[in-house]
UniProtKB/Swiss-Prot annotation:
It catalyses: [glutaredoxin]-dithiol + arsenate + glutathione + H(+) = glutathionyl-S-S-[glutaredoxin] + arsenite + H2O. Belongs to the ArsC family. The record marks H8, R60, R94, R107 as: Important for activity. GO terms for molecular function: arsenate reductase (glutaredoxin) activity. Its EC number is 1.20.4.1. It comes from the Bacteria. Pfam families: ArsC. Induction: Induced by sodium arsenite. SUPFAM superfamilies: Thioredoxin-like (SSF52833). It comes from Escherichia coli (strain K12). This is Arsenate reductase.
Length: 141
């Protein structure tokens, strides 16, 4: 079993790039398709705490439930926002990666490089062609 977990949405380019950077470090992570298998309340609360971000910082804004539920308004408690994320997992921003070195919301995808225990094994370019890692496994920016 891997010591790296990614909360992944295969329809998201950032999530796909993050997954491939994990694989480029020589590790096959545990992949949780969070839209199909959302975290429990306790898991979500722990992820947020471990990332050191606010509940609202994990909330996706460019999806239908955000508008429909009026989540732009600052009237909801953190507990209520978590309820909405559990009811509508599409509201959870992604990808979230958990490693022995930390937990991060990997936006942009290069954030994952900060918490991977093993170095990149070679060059890596994002799906759009942007070069992120050189042939020696070193981050370019």
């Amino acid at each position: 079993m891997s010591n790296i977990t990614i909360y992944h949405n295969p329809a998201c380019g950032t999530s796909r790039n993050t997954l491939e950077m994990i694989r480029n470090s020589g590790t096959e992570p545990t992949i949780i398709h969070y839209l199909e298998t959302p975290p429990t309340r306790d898991e979500l609360v722990k992820l947020i705490a471990d990332m050191g971000i606010s509940v609202r910082a994990l909330l996706r804004k460019n999806v239908e439930p955000y508008e429909e539920l009026g989540l732009a308004e600052d009237k909801f408690t953190d507990d209520r926002l978590i309820d909405f994320m559990l009811q509508h997992p599409i509201l959870i921003n992604r990808p979230i990666v958990v490693t022995p070195l930390g937990t991060r919301l990997c936006r942009p995808s290069e954030v994952v490089l900060e918490i991977l225990p093993d170095a990149q094994k070679g060059a890596f370019s994002k799906e759009d062609g942007e070069k992120v890692v050189d042939e020696a496994g070193k981050r370019l920016k």
